[in-house]
């Protein structure tokens, strides 16, 4: 027994620090892994475009992935449309350079946001539910496209938040989406829509 205790005390301090460092790194790696989107979401290959989309675990995971694929296709079509039509406009250059169709996913179950753009388009995430915690009822494609254009408007906007510049870009993209037959704007003042537990009551397309 005395021999074993002696070995412990003569152990090089650098060895102990090395073990502590390794343990610390393992804990950090585990935290990062379990906090990633891929761990909290289920990634499904869409039958629409063959790409993989990460969505919440639900009975309709395939429908959810296909819904994101359809929205991604429409967003790409809109971005390409305005890029060809307005190649010199600064807001369009920001949109074209910022939008990343490879990083479209559903919001995490723990997310406080209904939808968001990370780093001005590096990643777009959407709640796909009509009611916030009801994974059984997906939002309709038309309403989700309105939300997607809202997020694309953030990508096109230099300022942060919902300032005048944002609302001008939002209305502009809605007008272009209408002209390109990508999205037919709906007057939510006349007919509000429920989306992820909130009510959409306004559409800047109809603002004078």
Predicted regions and their residues:
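Compositionally biased low-complexity segments enriched in polar/charged residues
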Residues: 1-4, 208
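Metalloprotease/metallohydrolase-associated module, dominated by Zn2+-dependent proteases
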Residues: 23-49, 58-139, 159-208
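Surface-exposed beta-strand-to-loop junctions
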Residues: 50-55, 145-149
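Active-site recognition of the HExxH zinc-binding catalytic motif
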Residues: 146-158
């Amino acid at each position: 027994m005395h021999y074993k205790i002696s070995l412990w005390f003569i152990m090089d301090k650098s060895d102990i620090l090395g073990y502590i460092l390794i343990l610390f790194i393992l804990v950090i790696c585990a935290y990062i892994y379990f906090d990633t989107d891929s761990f909290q979401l289920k990634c499904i290959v869409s039958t629409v475009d063959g790409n993989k989309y990460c969505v919440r675990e639900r009975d309709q995971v395939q429908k959810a992935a296909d819904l994101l694929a359809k929205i991604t296709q429409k967003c790409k079509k809109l971005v390409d449309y305005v890029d060809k039509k307005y190649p010199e406009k600064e807001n369009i250059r920001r949109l074209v350079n910022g939008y990343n169709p490879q990083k479209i996913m559903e919001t995490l179950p723990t997310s406080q946001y209904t939808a968001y753009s990370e780093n001005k388009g590096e990643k777009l995430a959407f709640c796909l539910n009509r009611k916030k915690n009801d994974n059984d009822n997906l939002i309709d494609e038309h309403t989700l496209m309105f939300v997607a254009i809202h997020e694309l408007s953030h990508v096109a906007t230099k300022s942060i938040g919902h300032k005048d510049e944002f609302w001008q870009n939002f209305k502009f993209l809605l007008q272009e989406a209408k002209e390109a037959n990508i999205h037919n704007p709906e007057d939510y003042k006349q007919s509000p829509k429920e989306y992820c537990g909130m009510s959409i009551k306004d559409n800047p397309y109809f603002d004078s």
